[in-house]
Amino acid sequence: MAEPLAVDPTGLSAAAAKLAGLVFPQPPAPIAVSGTDSVVAAINETMPSIESLVSDGLPGVKAALTRTASNMNAAADVYAKTDQSLGTSLSQYAFGSSGEGLAGVASVGGQPSQATQLLSTPVSQVTTQLGETAAELAPRVVAKVPQLVQLAPHAVQMSQNASPIAQTISQTAQQAAQSAQGGSGPMPAQLASAEKPATEQAEPVHEVTNDDQGDQGDVQPAEVVAAARDEGAGASPGQQPGGGVPAQAMDTGAGARPAASPLAAPVDPSTPAPSTTTTL
């Protein structure tokens, strides 16, 4: 069976008085040794550090003991007063008569109102402190509000400037995604050669205009005339025109062509015959 908790305020007060009445001896005088050898020098160097532990720590120990004794006296006083108040409260609820019992019940009913008053006091203090704090912060809030109002248009303008950029980025991303899904993009541009202009490289080889064909037709009859002239110069007198050559060899007709030399280029039949009249 556990023993009931009991505190003896009288014994506690007596122990506190005894602790406070302790008398500590006076610390000895510093030790100093005369001499010049190494032992004397070592003693004079070591002893001050040992003596300082006592001389410096003793006042702190005395102060701690005095404080402990004072706390013990205060605790004994609290225990004594608490015991007295509890005895007085219990004596009010003694059931010696019916009137005393009813009075005790009435007193019990009145305790909640007292407790309410005790609880309401700290709450009112907290409310007052909150009101004072709010009053102190009010000027700062009022000072910050105009700054926020001035910064609001800048924030709206920044958001408006940022929206086109976001749209451009989204469009670029969509185009890149479509190109990736298509699998093939446009052919890359080729660099033009440094030796030929780009116009000559772009022109196909197989394309020949009608003007070029006409030029070729004009050149071929000139070559034929030159070859015939060379043959006439190297032939015998009997074979030159008018020198015994048969008439049918001279007169080939108005629309006939002169005989072509074996060295001359072949003549296209579809090409019209040019005039053979030359000026010497």
UniProtKB/Swiss-Prot annotation:
Post-translational events: Phosphorylated at Ser-70.
Biased composition (Low complexity): 167-181, 246-280
Modified positions (Phosphoserine) in chain numbering: 70
Annotated compartments: Secreted
Residue runs in coiled coils: none
Keywords for this protein: Phosphoprotein, Secreted, Virulence
One CC-aspect GO term: extracellular region
Primary localization class, coarse: secreted
Region (Disordered): 167-280
Task performed by this protein: Could be involved in regulation of growth and intracellular survival.
Protein name: ESX-1 secretion-associated protein EspJ
Natural source organism: Mycobacterium tuberculosis (strain CDC 1551 / Oshkosh)
Gene: espJ
